[in-house]
């Protein structure tokens, strides 16, 4: 006797296997590091991922990865998040192509050319303006466009930093920008609660990514130098470990979590 397929059981099974099937997420900085890890996790769970990035080499590598994944639904767009028009066009394009926006991870950020090397008294105006324009104003541009288009019950996760929770000497511009991201997150969470739109942040500590390597290049730190960050876990974290926390906050298991900042730092001391 042939089996009779129950559509409700089949749908339930698919949701268990692919809990984000039918969902559409935007990820800035999504072609490398934490952004790419987040996009990969969401895609594996069935979501459509819409990546924004500015690095052509990283974007090409991401294209190779996602085009090689059976059934992956994705788009990759060149977007400078410090430019309002590019951000708006990117989000409008998501709606036009995929019909909805269920959530977003705002990961894109810069550390500048003097990260960890210059005190406030020596701060360069252009360096300050660039870091704030991308990390803080750019995140606001993204949030604004996303909140105007996101579905009720959607979720936005902003990537702040341990630098948004503490102050570090010779990191003034980066610290200020990441403190600002946390302030934006908490304000937007209050403003959008009536629609049950969740807005949270993650604060990564020592996570090995291309951005961390750039910082080491600036300060002259060898890649094989002994671990020296004040973390109880005596190692750097990974982009995938951070992406898993972001995916949790974007997904269906965090529906009463908003206005929070999740540290991903191996117990920073």
Curated annotation (Swiss-Prot):
GO terms for biological process: abscisic acid biosynthetic process. Keywords: NADP, Oxidoreductase, Virulence. Its EC number is 1.1.1.-. One of its GO terms (molecular function) is oxidoreductase activity. It comes from the Eukaryota. InterPro entries: NAD(P)-bd_dom_sf (IPR036291), SDR_fam (IPR002347). Induction: Expression is up-regulated in spores. The keyword NADP applies. SUPFAM superfamilies: NAD(P)-binding Rossmann-fold domains (SSF51735). Belongs to the short-chain dehydrogenases/reductases (SDR) family. PANTHER family: DEHYDROGENASES, SHORT CHAIN, ESTRADIOL 17-BETA-DEHYDROGENASE 8-RELATED. Short-chain dehydrogenase/reductase involved in the biosynthesis of abscisic acid (ABA), a phytohormone that acts antagonistically toward salicylic acid (SA), jasmonic acid (JA) and ethylene (ETH) signaling, to impede plant defense responses. During pathogen-host interaction, ABA plays a dual role in disease severity by increasing plant susceptibility and accelerating pathogenesis in the fungus itself. This is Short-chain dehydrogenase/reductase ABA4. It comes from Pyricularia oryzae (strain 70-15 / ATCC MYA-4617 / FGSC 8958) (Rice blast fungus). The gene is ABA4.
